[in-house]
Each structure stands twice: as structure tokens, then as C-alpha cells.
């Protein structure tokens, strides 16, 4: 999902916590069940012995969605005049509590697909007032297989009065014994945004321009295990982007067109020993992707190429504390059009920077994060990192490296599936973000 779409649906979660908490206070329940609604995270029925201890039930039920802030709106019942009415109202609230409480349980052995739904009003400074909905599901291709982790799928939609919208589906399909995987993303979005130009020096001029970016993306990968934890596979990518409603009279991106369509075909090689993908406690993840965009399969004027590299490492350092490291690089061929350039920022890397403020052909980022469970479902993190955008390796300038650091809170929805609240800082910038699952 996009950064704004995840923030849109997640804010609804916070509102639902307040509403159901208020209902609990008026109806005098002895306690509430733990809650969650989550985009599919592959949770094995029996976690490894060295995982962090399971958190006790939390009194706040919640539901989460995609990448902008959003909340499941469930109004608390009004004070009643009679015992019968009160019983009916308590029954309604209890059904809500039970619904989210049961979503923490693995029902993939009983159901073909176990869906959880959430939705409600949303607001953020980027997207304004809106509404978002989410359906997150877990399923198993073989419900007699207790070794393979569940597959997941998420469907989401967001719309706001500012003109922002996002509709999409994404997921991971895991085959028997994790020997084959398919992951996919399909998204349609339109977002009012800004551009500062291309390159580090353009940002220093502080001359941003507004425009609306519409995007249609389809991405899919197939991976097959060839050695223990080692995978090889292919990928397909289709991307259509166009800019409109821009301010100013000069061209928005110089002599580049405002609309591009690209189709990419590529190869992926990975080593993945992580114990749990959304929130690893141990393991190593190495990934190399090489994608070619043929001229005849799009509107670009030449054959384009993109290479990406990821190296992640996770290790327990003391009780309930994980040290995580992430190194990421993205390298595009010369002449790459504006929609395909590397964009710094977002909710995964260089948190605190507006995504797209620093844009160029190539990008390298690194970050080190300490993750500590504090009490029950509550945890905290602190991180530090740096990043650089540059046109070519020969023009790489260490003096243009940008700092990044921040801290955050974690609340566990399901076992090892967290809502994260982060506040990131950078060069002359800072930003709050709310999302689901760890950043890397």
C-alpha cells in the first residue's frame, strides 16, 4: 500500500479503541477480550521456543488497515432506561468485543479463508477528512498442513475530500513447506502531492510545486526454494503514472512527459532465514532483483533497467530485545523517467522524510533499530540511520548524506503483529507515522 493509504485506514483503529473503551465504562463489563484486525501476517501455529513470550490479553480491542490513519467506527450504546434495553445494548457491544477478540485466534484450519473487517472515518494532514475500509484474511492451501505458515491477503479502499483515493489488494501465497511463494500487489491511487525537483541540490532551493499523481500498479513475484532458505524466481511489473493539476506555468519535470507506462520483467534471488517475516526475532534476509523494462512494452524511449539490493539482519541482544539492521540500495539506468526514480522517505526507510522530497536515479539507505518489549503488549523502539540520493556512482557525494533517527511505540494486535507509532527526524524535517508491522 502507499504511505497515505496505510495511514488512512489505521487511524480508524485508534477511534475504535476509544469508542469501545467508552462502552465498557458504561456497561460495567468485568473485562474485555484481546483485539485485532490485521493485514495477513503469516503466524505459525506453534512459534519457535526462543520467540518473545506471548503477551497477556489487552483491554483495548482494535482493528487495523492499510497505510494512512483510519479507525473502525463502532459507536458506544447510549445509557438505557430499562434492564431489557441495557441487556440488548450490552449484547451488541459484546458481539463487537468477541469479534475482535476471536480475530486473534488461528482459524485457518477450520475456514477456507479467515477474514477480519475494519473501517471508519480517517484524517491526516496529507489526505484530509476521509473514510477507509479493510478486509484482511488468512488461509491455508492445505488445511491439514500444520508446518507451513498461513498465506495472507488484504483488500483495502480509502477516499478523502482532498481528492485522494486508493483501492488495492496485496498478499502472499505460501505453498507446502514454504518451498514456493507468490507475492502480489494491485493498486489504483490518486494523491495530491509535491515535487521539489530531481536531485539533492533542487531540494535546497526549497521551491516545491504541487500536483496530483495518479498511479496504477501491478506487481507479482514467484519464488522457488533451490537450497535451504535460498530462493530464485521471476517477477512481473506493470506501472502507469501521470501528473496533472500542477501549479506554475513551466513544465513540471522539464522536458519529460507527464504520463508514462512501463512493463518490467525480471529475476529475483533471495536468501531468507527469518523466523517470521512481519516481525523477525532472528535470521538473515538477502535479496537481489534485476528488472528490465523493454521499450516495446511501454511508452519509454529506451530499454530501462532497475537493480535493488536488500540486506537485513536480526539478533536477540538481551531479554525481550531485538537488534535489527537494514541496508537497501536502488539503482536505475540513465534516462529513467520521473515516476520510476528512487524516492527517499516513507514508512519503511528514512522515516521522517516526506516521500519523494529527495528523488534521483539511485538511492542507498542504512538503519539500525533496537526493539524492546516493555510490558505485556507494549514495546518501544529507537533507530538511527542515513541515506543518500545521487545520479550516478561517480557523482556520489558523502557531504550530501542525510541523517535519520527517531523513536516509536509498539502495541501487539496479534501474536508478533504490531501497530507501530513512529516519530522520525531528518535534515530540517520531522514526521509522525502510524502503520502496521515493523518497518523492516
Question: PLM ranges: what are they?
Answer:
Residues 266-267, 406-413, 429-440:
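Outer-membrane beta-barrel "beta-signal"
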Residues 107-117, 123-261, 418, 426-440:
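Gram-negative/organellar outer-membrane beta-barrel architecture
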Residues 117-119, 135, 153-157, 182-186, ...:
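Membrane-embedded beta-strand positions of outer-membrane beta-barrel proteins
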Residues 332-420:
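Outer membrane beta-barrel transmembrane domains
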Residues 155-156, 203-208, 249-256, 293-299, ...:
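Extracellular loop and loop/strand-boundary signature of outer-membrane beta-barrel proteins
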Amino acid at each position: 500500500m502507499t504511505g497515505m493509504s496505510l495511514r488512512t485506514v489505521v487511524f480508524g483503529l485508534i477511534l475504535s479503541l476509544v469508542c469501545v473503551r467508552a462502552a465498557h465504562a458504561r456497561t460495567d463489563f468485568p473485562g474485555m477480550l484481546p483485539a485485532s484486525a490485521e493485514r495477513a501476517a503469516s503466524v505459525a501455529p506453534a512459534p519457535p521456543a526462543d520467540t518473545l513470550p506471548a503477551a497477556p490479553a489487552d483491554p483495548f480491542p482494535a482493528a487495523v488497515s492499510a497505510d494512512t490513519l483510519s479507525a473502525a467506527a463502532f459507536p458506544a450504546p447510549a445509557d438505557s432506561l430499562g434492564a431489557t434495553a441495557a441487556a440488548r445494548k450490552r449484547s451488541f457491544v459484546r458481539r463487537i468485543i468477541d469479534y475482535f477478540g476471536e480475530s486473534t485466534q488461528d482459524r485457518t484450519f477450520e475456514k477456507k479463508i479467515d477474514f477480519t473487517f475494519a473501517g471508519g472515518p480517517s484524517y491526516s494532514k496529507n489526505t484530509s477528512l476521509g473514510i477507509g475500509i479493510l478486509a484482511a484474511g488468512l488461509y491455508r492451501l492445505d488445511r491439514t498442513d500444520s508446518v507451513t505458515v498461513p498465506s495472507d491477503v488484504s483488500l483495502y479502499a480509502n477516499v478523502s475530500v482532498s481528492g485522494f483515493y486508493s483501492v488495492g489488494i496485496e498478499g502472499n501465497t505460501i505453498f507446502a513447506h514454504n518451498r514456493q511463494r507468490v507475492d502480489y500487489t494491485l493498486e489504483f491511487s490518486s494523491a495530491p502531492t509535491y515535487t521539489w525537483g530531481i536531485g539533492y541540490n533542487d531540494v535546497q532551493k526549497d521551491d516545491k510545486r504541487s500536483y496530483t499523481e495518479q498511479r496504477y500498479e501491478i506487481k507479482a513475484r514467484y519464488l522457488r526454494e533451490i537450497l535451504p532458505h535460498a530462493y530464485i524466481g521471476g517477477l512481473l511489473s506493470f506501472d502507469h503514472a501521470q501528473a496533472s493539476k500542477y501549479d506554475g506555468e513551466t513544465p513540471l519535470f522539464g522536458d519529460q512527459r507527464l504520463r508514462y507506462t512501463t512493463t518490467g520483467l525480471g529475476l529475483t534471488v533471495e536468501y531468507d532465514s527469518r523466523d517470521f517475516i512481519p516481525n523477525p526475532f532472528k535470521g538473515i534476509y538477502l535479496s537481489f532483483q534485476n528488472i528490465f523494462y523493454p521499450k516495446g512494452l511501454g511508452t519509454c524511449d529506451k530499454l530501462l533497467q532497475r537493480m535493488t539490493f536488500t540486506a537485513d539482519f536480526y539478533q536477540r541482544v538481551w531479554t525481550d530485545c531485538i537488534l535489527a539492521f537494514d541496508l537497501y540500495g536502488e539503482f536505475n539506468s540513465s534516462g529513467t523517467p520521473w515516476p520510476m526514480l528512487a524516492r527517499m522517505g516513507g514508512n519503511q526507510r528514512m522515516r521522517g522524510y516526506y516521500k519523494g522530497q529527495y528523488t534521483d536515479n539511485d538511492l542507498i539507505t542504512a538503519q539500525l533499530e533496537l526493539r524492546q518489549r516493555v510490558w505485556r503488549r507494549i514495546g518501544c523502539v529507537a533507530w538511527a540511520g542515513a541515506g543518500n540520493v545521487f545520479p550516478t556512482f561517480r557523482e556520489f557525494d558523502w557531504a550530501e548524506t542525510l541523517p535519520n533517527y527517531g523513536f516509536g511505540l509498539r502495541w501487539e494486535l496479534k501474536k508478533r503483529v504490531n501497530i507501530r507509532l513512529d516519530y522520525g527526524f531528518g535534515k530540517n524535517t520531522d514526521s509522525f507515522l502510524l502503520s502496521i508491522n515493523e518497518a523492516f
